From Swiss-Prot:
Cofactor: Mn(2+)
Pfam family, one: Peptidase_M17_N
Record's GO cellular component terms: cytoplasm
GO molecular function: manganese ion binding; metalloaminopeptidase activity
Keywords: Aminopeptidase, Cytoplasm, Hydrolase, Manganese, Metal-binding, Protease
Domain of life where this protein originates: Bacteria
SUPFAM superfamilies the UniProt entry points to: Macro domain-like, Zn-dependent exopeptidases
Active site positions: K284, R358
Classification via PROSITE patterns: CYTOSOL_AP (PS00631)
Stated name of the protein: Probable cytosol aminopeptidase
Family the entry assigns: Belongs to the peptidase M17 family.
Positions annotated to bind Mn(2+) 1: D277, D354, E356
Predominant location category: cytoplasm
Amino acid sequence: MRYHISTNFFKKKYSDCLVFGIFDDLQLCESVKVIDSGSDGYVSRLIKDNEISGQINESLLLHSIPNFQKLKILFLGCGKKERFNINLYQKLFKTSINIIKKLSVKALIYFVTDFHIKNINTYWKIRHAVSEIQDNLYSFKNFKTSNNKNKFKISLEDIYFYLSDHDEINSGNNAIQHGYAISKGKKIARDLSNMPPNICNSSYLADQAMKLSQYYPDLIDVEIINDIDMNKLGMNAYLSVGKGSKNKSLMSIIKYHGISFSQCKNIILIGKGVTFDSGGISIKTSRDLDEMKFDMSGAAIVFGLMSIISDLKLPLNIIGILAGSENMVSSMSFRPGDILTTMSGKTVEILNTDAEGRLILCDVLTYVERFSPEVVIDIATLTGACVVALGHHTTGLLSNNDILAKDLQKASKQTRDLIWRMPLFEEYYKDLDSNVADMANVGTNSAGMITAACFLSKFSQKYAWAHLDVAGTAWISGKNKGSTGRPINLLTQFLLNKLYK
């Protein structure tokens, strides 16, 4: 897909389809007035006949318009102007693309400046329009045969954003560049998450990391920590998770050098990369077990983010860690009742081998102390309890630092990539007490998302840390299962905000 800024919407090469927003006050923007006048009041007659109401969720596609026979016009209802918001704006692009995909349209033009949102500028509108369009054009057909692949082709090739103000052209072009880089990185993350576990294991993650460094040799260095190295480091909790699998655990460290100043501290992004989670000895039921390939979504998100960061050449120093492992059942698997000594020296009693993500993360959280980080954010499909508490719309946020938490909440509000902060009250820590070790790896049956984060917080006391539990938001379940790429939009905005502080 190619994206462009246009200041003239009547050029023949992109006159296949025009897309307008219309509010319920039915006031026509200047561009629609030109169409209305040129078609002898055709649009006005449709409004008079109640064919166009401007109500939210309403859409009307016009063909064979008088004096514009080859032109299609799509009107998208925006509802009340004072209630129009980011959420509704993003949904309109999903609606429009779902309609356009069914048409023989090679080029279309969006009149984004007519979508009025309070305190939102043209740059934001275009950047998020590109991102929403690319999201809704996404499909994962890598393992379909060539005959089947052809069924999913669409005719659309070029999308234009009309700007009447020439002073906004540079901003519009920047928005396209940024939006496309973000959506490209999101696609990379979704593709990686959607890969089958017989192909995507820890070695595959490491190979992808190495390819990224080859693509951006001046910006990225990669170090792969294998199981022998981890054993020397004392990362016994991490290693225990992969003991039952023939696929060895590997930790891929992607170092992005966006600025040469040594005083610029590192931002650390850690992604849980369990490429398949059987639950281990505490084995899961067979229902939806195929979806446990998505337990590496955190690592995929971090990988996608490192691609975005490199494309945008952000002047930041960022380290992304893909914590790869596979939790399988065998005679070599770790067991309930085992006591593990973590890299930090703290001991953990294993009560449930299906609470494996925190065992990987606790050692990685200790490992990253060597980088003297400014902030550390881990992204993990950690607990089913998060899904129970927040469902599939909202990512769980837990943090030991109010400033970091507020920065993430701000980015969430800017992108509407939803998160909700949960508490780390002292009372919850008691649930992790063990009579034979420093702590247990699970608490009681209640507040599972919180106690899991309490566990992690014991290993992240030397820096500002946030945990994003994406168990409910990283993928969609069921027949149409697939990765969502969340929370890439949020984390990209968080990093961009760092530049403007």
